Structures are given as C-alpha cells and as structure tokens.
A protein has these predicted regions:
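Beta-strand-rich recognition domains
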Residues: 18-158
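Bacterial N-terminal signal peptides
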Residues: 4-13
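Short, ordered, surface-exposed loop/turn motifs in non-cytosolic proteins
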Residues: 158-172
Length: 172
C-alpha cells in the first residue's frame, strides 16, 4: 500500500498525469476540522473550512474503473471519502503529505453532476487535516500508478558495493 502511495505522490508531477484522461476537480487546499478547537498551532489563525468537504463537479459516466487522486496531510483518523453517497475508501492515516490514489468503480460517476464528500469519522479525537489538489484520472489505478517507476541504487563511492539504507522521497 505504501509503495502505491509513494508512486501516487510522484504522479502529480509527471507529464503522463496531465494527459487528456486527467481532470482537476479542485486545485485549492482545504483545512478541515472543528471550529474553535485547533489541533495545531498553525491552525490557530486559520479557521477550518468545516468538518467536511463537499465538492460538486461535472464528469462523464465511467464505464470502467477510474482513479481519484487526493493530496492530504496531517491525517490521524480514517476520514471517509464518498462519491455520490457511495464510500470509495478512507484517507490514509499518515501525518506526512502524500497523494492518495483511490479506485473509482465502474459506474460510480454520473454523466453531468457528481458530488465528492470527505468527512470526519464519528470520533471525539481532534483531527485538523489539509486536503486538496483533487483530480480524477479516467484510467484504472493500476495504469495510473504504473506510469511511474523509480530505480535507485545506493553504493559505496570507493568500492561500488551496495549499501543498506533507508530513503525518504518528497515532492518539494
């Protein structure tokens, strides 16, 4: 799962993602949470958009699986992602920024108006999150994520021997 998320993180910067199959649904970032109860200092002066995000957009019906891409950060609980009232999945519980790739089953999109909802789960735990840069790719998730490959080798400069290591890839 993490490998798929990592590939999705790189995806938004790739030229392949900007193809005709790619539709930006919302380019803005939205702070979601409970008003008056900021979880982090950075949200003290930034009131939340609300406890959920409702986004309406026009699209074509999807005869095959498509992929919903959502940039997210500071997620500590499983926020639900719904399309036209149907649950697609949950945001990844991870505080680091990432792009989540959720499969959109065939027939889930309607021709014309559609509604995407990201809503907090019923929980007493505070969870201020940031979501945005939401896009829809008409290709199945496997195809979308298959566009990106990374080949990294870490070797000793003198001997050329492979070195054990841990890498963190970021999009900044």
């Amino acid at each position: 799962m993490f490998r798929l998320l990592l590939f999705a993180l790189i995806l938004l910067g790739s030229a392949a993602a900007r193809s005709a199959s790619y539709q930006v649904l919302d380019a803005k970032r939205h702070h979601l949470g409970v008003a008056g109860l900021p979880e982090w200092d950075e949200f003290e002066t930034s009131p939340p958009h609300g406890p959920q995000l409702d986004l309406t957009f026009a699209a074509e019906a999807n005869p095959r699986e498509a992929t919903l891409l959502i940039r997210q950060r500071e997620v500590k609980t499983a926020w639900n992602v719904l399309l036209n009232g149907r649950k697609l999945g949950v945001l990844e519980t991870l505080t680091q920024p990432l792009v989540l790739a959720l499969p959109v089953p065939a027939g889930a999109l309607r021709k014309g108006g559609n509604r995407l909802t990201i809503m907090r789960p019923p929980s007493r735990m505070l969870d201020d999150i940031v979501v945005g840069e939401i896009a829809l790719d008409s290709r199945p998730r496997g195809e979308v994520l298959g566009d990106v490959t990374i080949d990294i080798r870490v070797t000793d400069a003198e001997s050329g021997a492979a070195l054990p290591c841990r890498l963190t890839l970021v999009d900044q």
